[in-house]
Amino acid sequence: TVAREQVELSDVISFHNYDNPRSFESRVTSLLLYRRPLLCTEYMARSNGSTFQGTLPVAKKYNVAAFNWGLVEGKTQTTLPWDSWQHPYIDHPPPIWFHDIFRTNGTPYSADEVDFIRSITGRGTPQ
């Protein structure tokens, strides 16, 4: 198939996965069969069961680079979930942020997430 040939001709494999940790791990193990470095260039969607605490340990276990889409709440509106097209969050924020990690004032959306990210990346506490 075309998809198989694309992967086989690639030096690295980049992919997106917004699913739960079990699905993420299944995707990773299937891609590892091609024996290429793996780059997960989008992975975090809290309301879809894809979280830092669920995804990053799997990525670390298999040495997969993981890039988060969204850092600070802002104009790109990546706090909004996919259903915001059907249910605009005009007068209230979504109950669960989709991507971003920090509010515009620099405070974390979830201190537990930030602590976890520091822990798993070996960054420790800020100076």
Predicted regions: what is each one?
Residues 119-127:
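Non-catalytic accessory regions flanking glycosidase/transglycosidase catalytic cores in CAZymes
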Residues 1-116:
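Extracellular glycoside hydrolase catalytic/binding regions
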